[in-house]
């Protein structure tokens, strides 16, 4: 039973799920808005909000911590220097999820996730 389980498995192994969230986070940082499945978006929100809170500090250690999760220099630099400073006075809630439509092939719910 999955009572009080802390995260969604998304039908993937742990390494595949970790890679998926990393790639979605990089795409969100690069484009500021992406469309994906609703449950992937909800998991990504948790992942990216923790990174943004860390990046708000803006020092070298924050840069290292974010890079350890993303493994992408450009995305790390953009998050720490451009995106996170905008939320210096905001305590959480850096992203917005909006349900958009249903995917034509399998009728799953799609959503856009974007920085507020």
Swiss-Prot record:
A GO biological-process term: translation
Leader sequence segment: none
PROSITE patterns, per the entry: RIBOSOMAL_L17
Keyword hit for Flavoprotein: no
Domain of life assignment: Bacteria
Gene Ontology molecular function terms on file: structural constituent of ribosome
Entry GO terms, CC: cytosolic large ribosomal subunit
Keywords from the UniProt entry: Ribonucleoprotein, Ribosomal protein
HAMAP family reported for this sequence: Ribosomal_bL17
Complexes and interactors: Part of the 50S ribosomal subunit. Contacts protein L32.
Similarity comment text for this entry: Belongs to the bacterial ribosomal protein bL17 family.
Name used for this protein in its record: Large ribosomal subunit protein bL17
